[in-house]
Regions:
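Interfacial/gating helices of multi-pass transporter permease domains
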Residues: 1-17, 85-92, 154
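Membrane-helix interface/capping residues of multi-pass secondary transporters
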Residues: 3-6, 121, 149
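Small-residue-rich hydrophobic transmembrane alpha-helices
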Residues: 9-67, 72, 105-119, 123-124
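Small-residue-enriched core segments of transmembrane alpha-helices in multipass membrane transport
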Residues: 14-15, 129-136
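Alpha-helical transmembrane segments of multi-pass membrane proteins
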Residues: 17-19, 85-111, 138
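Short runs within selected transmembrane alpha-helices of multi-pass transporters and secretion channels
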Residues: 24-27, 98-117, 123-132, 152-168
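Short alpha-helical transmembrane segments in multi-pass integral membrane proteins
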Residues: 34-101, 143-181
Length: 183
């Protein structure tokens, strides 16, 4: 699709990566708290820490998504200086798609950190592989064929939405403690 398309999508993905890195740091703070509580047999603390972390991570990502949506031109303009270019247009489109997908990415990340903290490494690996593998790779082939260059801009955001939905259902299916009242 050309250099402009690649530049626009790359800039959007890197901006999202910075926001996601903050979320990863937050999740890394959650994991030892949850793991310690689980190891000590403090089920109510595991429940509370998961619930608190999931809610605050989703709220944080909603806030970041709203800010990204509102200031998309300014954020992308820091890296792309020509407003009418294909790169700027695709960066804005991709950033808006990321803005919608941010809460879903939070669900996926916190779910993966939760399973890792519990020592359920197979489940943690499965959840972690959803974003960049299981959901992402098929969408790389499907979305550009359906939507052309716009499909390229939507791939990562669509993968995050799918991964977040699958993570939420998997969390509930595996008898997660998130939606039970604390003891």
């Amino acid at each position: 699709y050309g250099d402009g398309a690649m530049a626009g999508v790359t800039v959007a993905n890197k901006i999202f990566a910075v926001i996601f890195a903050v979320l990863v740091g937050y999740g890394q703070g959650f994991a030892p708290v949850c793991g310690f509580a689980y190891g000590a047999g403090l089920e109510s603390r595991v429940k509370r820490s998961l619930r608190f972390t999931m809610i605050t991570a989703v709220i944080f990502m909603c806030a970041m998504g709203a800010a990204t949506w509102v200031w998309v031109s300014e954020v992308a303009g820091v890296f792309l200086h020509e407003g009418g270019t294909q790169a700027m247009q695709l960066a804005a489109l991709s950033l808006r798609a990321h803005a919608i997908s941010m809460p879903f990415a939070a669900v996926c990340l916190v779910t993966g950190m939760y399973y890792q903290a519990l020592g359920a490494y197979g489940k943690a690996t499965l959840i972690s592989a959803l974003r960049q593998g299981v959901c992402f790779i098929p969408l790389v082939f499907i979305l550009p064929r359906m939507y052309g260059v716009d499909g390229v801009a939507f791939v990562q955001a669509a993968a995050d939405v799918l991964a977040g939905i699958v993570s939420a259902f998997y969390l509930l299916y595996t008898n997660c403690l998130l939606y039970t009242s604390p003891s």
